Amino acid sequence: MYTTMFLGAIAGLSLFLYGMQLMGDGLQKVAGEGLKGIIRKLTKNRFMSVLVGMFVTTIIQSSSATTVMVVGFVNAGLMTLAQAVGVVFGANVGTTITGQMVSFNLSQWAPLVIAAGLVANMLTKNPKVKEASEIFIGFGILFIGMSSLSSALQPLKELPEFTNWILQYGSNPFIGVGIGLLMTLVLQSSSATIGVLIALASQGVLPITTAVFIIFGDNIGTCTTALISSLGTSRRGKQVALFHLMINVIGTIYFMLFLRGILVNVVESIDPGNVARQIANAHTIFNIVNVIVLFPFTNLLIKLIQIIIPDGEEEEESITRYLDKRILVTPSIALENTMYEFAAMAQETSSALENAIGAARTRDKKLVKKALENEKNINAYEKAIVKY
């Protein structure tokens, strides 16, 4: 029984993650150039940056991916720390959309949605329609995965040992937060963790009083991806990743100390008896309240971050400024950044030609040295661009 349950849960979770990725890829392809324009233009205003973070995370389907992308922008000098923190706030809210979707039992419609997507994909040659069809296919697979995960976990409600374990250890705040952190660290997706909690709740083995602690840990665990990604970046890139961790840890602390009971009462009053919906709502409310509470203190938090990781002289930078792998999650922006590097390479080539001609005419050794340096830089540009 345990083997069957485990394999079924793994299969369901895999379908859930694949569907989420496919839907996100489709949304991103459809958004395309519009996504690039939104990020570039609207992040100049900090409040609008929050909305941009929500929108982009809804498209990408991952707050971790959004934060990693923002770390890349800051590292490449395309975004300031002040702009980035607003996007991070919004990403935390945007990532709750997936949990809201899967908390509704729409699995009976999933085959129809997949069929519609497949028909549209096969019958049209329009690339935009094909891209949009991926959204429907991913949406359907996501719900089939959720249904499979829930069905696989059904035997748990017949196991009193599991129920007793949940009641005994789940009520401990620190163990609950640790479980949530570990789950998200392993799954690398806060949405997947919420999906597992909703699947457990649908089988009646996870009360909301226990789930909220795991949700708090889930929000801390989602920061690990950006933290790891920031290790090879500039100081400002590291500051963005640390800011993400800081706001989620602060939110967890004051919710655990003062607002946990209120949060449970609110979500129970919104959807009495439906723990799956309560979990999704708790996840959303936590992140919205955290933005409302901490956003007014953004400047103070930035100063604190800069004390922990002070601004200073950076290590010797690569000749390329815009080629950051973290930005590859948004191909349209990554491609535009490559064009910037081509322009810089062309400028370097022009300088090389000018210095070479000057050296040939005047026999000036300084111009020869400059021309050789230009050649070295051109080779570095070529190598970096081709690799990217």
Where do the language-model regions lie?
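Helix-loop-helix hairpins and the membrane-proximal interhelical loops
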Residues: 2-46, 136-182, 200
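Core mid-bundle transmembrane helix pairs that form the ion/substrate translocation pathway
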Residues: 118-179, 246-250, 279-298
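Alpha-helical transmembrane segments of multi-pass membrane proteins, especially transporters
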Residues: 33, 37, 41, 45, ...
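Membrane-spanning helices that line or support transport/gating and their immediate boundary helices
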Residues: 22-30, 34, 38, 100, ...
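Membrane-interfacial helix-loop connectors
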Residues: 59-60, 68-95, 100-109, 117-121, ...
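Alpha-helical transmembrane segments and their lipid-water interface positions
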Residues: 15, 28, 64-68, 95-103, ...
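C-terminal ends of transmembrane helices
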Residues: 20-29, 70-75, 116-130, 226-233
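Cytosolic, long alpha-helical scaffolding segments
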Residues: 104-106, 206, 214, 232-238, ...
